[in-house]
Amino acid sequence: MPPKVDPSEKVEVFLRVCGGEAGAMSTLAPKLGPLGVSPKKVGDDIAKATQPWKGMKVSVKLTIQNRIAVPEVLPSASALVIKALKEPPRDRKKEKNIKHNGNIPLEEICKIAKTMRFKSLAVDFKGSVLEILGTAHSVGCKVNGKSPRDIQAGIQSGEIEVVEPK
């Protein structure tokens, strides 16, 4: 039998859930049971925290200390790009492999790049913007009415200047 977990110890658990849904408690139980946390209550907390991300898959970091779980949403770059499109939530059970065809301004891409900077492997901010533009290309949307690939080429050639938002 594994040793008992110290309740005052800080434990972090990472989960991938669909936004706004409580999820299957049976998948949470093996992870949270030994920590002395109720999977049902945690599932409800996660559903509340992920409500703005309804219909999208997002990562959630659960910080558990003294039998209290605090959920923190860690959206991926693609989730931020899709949210910037301001599309209505879709039923993910009925529609699969959705291509998004909206338009995002470059300033919004810069804001997303600033948000994702801590995860980025790029040396400078310009590299982070290029990463987010690649994500926008894979999502299938346009940036300033053009293909994200064209914007990337413009940034690399120096035609388009990228400024970090304050």
Swiss-Prot record:
GO molecular-function terms, A-Z: large ribosomal subunit rRNA binding; structural constituent of ribosome
UniProt keyword annotation of Ribonucleoprotein present: yes
CDD domains: Ribosomal_L11
Any Gene Ontology CC annotation: cytosolic large ribosomal subunit
Annotated keywords: Ribonucleoprotein, Ribosomal protein
Pfam families: Ribosomal_L11, Ribosomal_L11_N
Matches recorded under SMART domains: RL11 (SM00649)
Biological process annotations from GO: translation
PANTHER family the record matches: 60S RIBOSOMAL PROTEIN L12, LARGE RIBOSOMAL SUBUNIT PROTEIN UL11
Family named by the database record: Belongs to the universal ribosomal protein uL11 family.
Name of the featured protein: Large ribosomal subunit protein uL11
Lineage of the organism: Eukaryota, Amoebozoa, Evosea, Eumycetozoa, Dictyostelia
